């Protein structure tokens, strides 16, 4: 019984740490305190914004008219997360766990900084090569009816009026993620006249790896 209760407690803590992570981390205000059985929650960071290898893209502001005709702003910011090999144990915990690191690609929709839906492309193709792309979307509560946000604040749909305007930001992030996944480094040779058995390859992080040169005449 206690083991089962412990599982539910951990699941609840993880859920709240993600949903309210921007409040818990004190974004734009004093940090919110949430306790679960005397355990103080720490906010997660699904974008790993402070990681040196996170590719943080420019924030885009999209003006949208609400149901009363008043202009409101929807902000969109793409992120391309680091490779798993570049993550510390703390990074893995902050991102929500390594099991979700690849699976939860896509949009992260916030209503007044509260996460309401995440890890979806809203019908766009989910690709192995874009597994590190995540798009932060901030919407004000004045656009609830346009976004189709339900009373539980758990579901939202992208309105047709801004779907096309989001495409550019999404495609940019996905292109970056694909390039990061398909980059294989640059082969460096000390002497072009030498038929090396091993290729010395410089990767993005200035580290070197060695691979068999299968174009060598020896093979």
Q: Can you name each region flagged by the protein language model?
A:
Residues 4, 8-10, 43-45, 50-219:
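Charged regulatory segments coupled to nucleotide-binding catalytic modules in large multidomain enzymes
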Residues 39:
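Flexible loop/N-cap segments at domain edges
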Residues 1-36:
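GHKL-type ATPase core
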């Amino acid at each position: 019984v206690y083991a089962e209760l412990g599982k539910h407690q951990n699941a609840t803590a993880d859920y709240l740490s993600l949903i309210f992570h921007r409040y818990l981390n004190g974004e734009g205000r004093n940090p919110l305190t949430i306790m679960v059985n005397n355990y103080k929650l720490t906010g997660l960071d699904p974008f790993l914004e402070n990681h040196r290898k996170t590719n943080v893209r420019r924030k885009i502001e999209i003006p949208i008219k609400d149901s009363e005709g008043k202009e409101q702003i929807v902000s969109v910011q793409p992120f391309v997360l680091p490779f798993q090999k570049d993550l510390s144990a703390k990074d893995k915990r902050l991102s929500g766990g390594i099991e979700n690191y690849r699976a939860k690609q896509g949009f992260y929709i916030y209503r007044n900084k509260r996460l309401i839906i995440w890890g979806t492309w809203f019908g766009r193709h989910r690709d192995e090569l874009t597994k590190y792309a995540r798009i932060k979307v901030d919407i004000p509560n004045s656009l609830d009816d346009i976004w189709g946000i339900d009373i539980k604040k758990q579901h939202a749909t992208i309105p047709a009026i801004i779907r096309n305007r989001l495409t550019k930001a999404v495609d940019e992030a996905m292109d970056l993620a694909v390039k990061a996944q398909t980059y294989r480094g640059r082969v460096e040779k000390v002497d072009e006249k030498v038929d090396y058995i091993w290729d010395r390859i410089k990767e993005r992080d200035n580290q070197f790896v060695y691979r068999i040169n299968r174009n060598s005449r020896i093979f």
